[in-house]
């Protein structure tokens, strides 16, 4: 089972495309939708939905995957639910760059301070990070600096922030998923 979390643009047709691409790894891909506008409610909702899926799950090696803001959530929810994560261009600093787009961006900073201390150290090697060198929305170098001490970073030379084509990475993701 692969759980897919969309980014800020929840209505993007790219979400459906990514789900279809992920089905080459595992036919059981589940899109979990969330508001993107209310961080504390989103976190509660995502934890509840992912936990429900895991309770009914028969896959011994589930995976959670997210793009952009979905990557922010996939890393955290995956850690809290003890499943591996794959994140594409994760928005690691939404409290800085979501100003004016969501109701309370400061809630992201609050979530970060309330999350498990040093969670990335405890999550070491359980997240695969794929970053685009041409991310027009986020500073991918800054993301790499924050994540490289803990996770493997794979660099993409072609995709933009929304990462429309993940197919070149499907074999890598599949291998990462099988590590369980």
Swiss-Prot record:
Organism, as annotated: Salmonella paratyphi A (strain AKU_12601)
Family matches, as InterPro entries: AB_hydrolase_fold, UPF0227, UPF0227/Esterase_YqiA
Q: What is this protein called?
A: UPF0227 protein YcfP
Identify its protein family: Belongs to the UPF0227 family.
Tell me, what's a Pfam family for it? UPF0227
Which gene carries the instructions for this protein?
Answer: ycfP
